[in-house]
Amino acid sequence: MARKENILISAAVGLILLALPVLAAEKNKTNSASPEMAKPSYELPQPATETIDYTMYQRIRDEGLRHSHVMEYASALMDGIGERLTGSPNVKWANEWTRDQLAAMGCTNAHLEDWGEFGMGWQQINTWVRMASPDNAVFIAQAAPWSPSTNGAITGQALWVDIKKDTDIDKYKGKVAGKIVLLGEMREVKPEDKPLFQRYDAEQLDKLTEYPLKPQGEFDEYLKDLPRRLALQKKIAQFFAAEPPLAVIMPSRAGRDGGGSGGTIFVDRGLGWSVYKRENAMPVPVVVMAIENYGRVYRLLNANVPVSIEMDVDTKFLGDHEHGFDTIAEIPGTDPKLKDEVVMLGAHLDSWAAATGATDNGAGTVVSMEVMRILNALQVKPRRTIRIGLWTGEEEGIYGSAGYVKQHFGFVPLSTAPDQLKLPEWLRKPAGPLELKPEQQKISAYFNVDNGSGMIRGIYLQENAAIAPIFKQWIQPLKDIGVTTLTMRNTGGTDHESFDNVGIPGFQFIQDKLDYSTRTHHSNMDTYERLQEPDLEQAATVEAIFVSNAAMRDQMLPRKPLPHPELEEQRNAPLKKLMPGAEDVPQKAPEQM
């Protein structure tokens, strides 16, 4: 027995000795691979060919296009809840309703997240304006957001004031108190010779694929003049605080692509910026009036005909330190190695107060909710976690998504240069460097819908060249439902920027314009009737496919290099000692203290 045991022991030792080189080789192989394996998967080489699950495409298309519930969500949100101004009771109601609906459809971890203090809560209860003399006329008007109340109906003589620069204020000292002031020049109302409702044609979509070598300077000019206009508005507000008129009437602006007449009023401005902060509060009631009504009073006054106005602005303030909240919910990942990684989608839930915020951005909200419903209905088991974010505070400065990103992923410090501190926070330049959190490496992408009710025609790549061949393959089976276009261009002004700013792939879809810029954007006409059912069904279907693809791939989506705004000044500085024969300019010695 002992001899047999010795033989067995000897054999075992021999096997171990034979195995040692193999084990050592495996160990060396693991060690040599570990630096590569330690990298986030978005840094690894991407496959040339995407694994497309055509069965999943078809299942999502069938559920999204044949069994949609998107319009039911739309009616409940727009008709049942209504306007959703940040800080208002309605936006709180919408936060809670979306949370409960997402939980009811099968999402997990449905909750609200506080993104911080916003400012004053406010509601418009009722507003009406009429001309009492020289004729009776009922006018179209609404209170500017965060306007104080008139505390009952008032009657006053109309006075038009023309203030284009600081010194113009002096002309009206001692004249505005007790009057109803018309503030703003009468703009030209041109014929609407182009359709207010438009879809992209093939030529326009092809034009979108061209990358402009020089950025358009229109917005730069706007920014350059903005500090002057902000300072002027502040001085006008101070003037009205010192010599208070009964109320101020402002004309509705024009639409970006036409429109802004025919009873449509764009109600997204007041007397100053950040008027939801107590320190910037408007000193007197302010309303925005239809351009045709404003024009009649303007012409009468300029013909020296006295005009008497009656009006009542009934508004309610609800506190100076209201907080903003985002609605968050998930479909949990199931792959043990990938479930901690996240694919996000979202839209902003808040709106302006003049209507029910249907196209801006109830449409994006209900499309995002429908995406989650589709995936839950199909009992999709994503490898990565799919997370929805419905943001508030977008209309005032993209606060909700920026707050969420700062809490979870990182943030970019803003410039504190004197000229920058004069601007609203959402317009200040990033100063850097980025401050990132560990979660930033765990999110694959964020997909956003916020361009109205139009169907999806493609996607803005935000200059992410590595993503182009991937998305090109994703949209190939979607061309029959209108998705054809990828553009390297950036687009801005909405929540994907919060993610893009900290190095996370953030995307906004290209959507048909419809009447978004001409009739509904921030207007009193932004109601359920402006929603296009087939377009919303298509948008939810397309986004569900994008989200599913991102959640099921082996790797996270590739990223652009991290932004370094702190290096911008250095990178843009003129080259030194470049010109032959140029003499050095002596540096001025520092003054002695």
Language-model features: where?
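Second-shell loop/turn segments in exported
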Residues: Y57-L65, D79-N90, T127, P145, ...
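N-terminal capping segment at the start of a domain
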Residues: A48-S88, S261, D350, N448-G454, ...
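Bacterial N-terminal signal peptides
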Residues: S10-L20
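Catalytic-core environment of secreted peptidases
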Residues: H67-V91, R99-M105, N109, K173-K175, ...
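Metal-dependent peptidase/peptidase-like ectodomains
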Residues: P134-A137, N151-G156, G174, G178, ...
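Soluble metallo-hydrolase cores and metallopeptidase-like ectodomains found primarily
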Residues: M56, I140, W146-K171, G272-A358, ...
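Noncatalytic luminal/extracellular "stalk/propeptide" segments of secretory-pathway proteins
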Residues: K29-M56, S75, D79-P215, T416
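Active-site-adjacent substrate-binding region
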Residues: E218-L230, A237, A241-A242, A247, ...
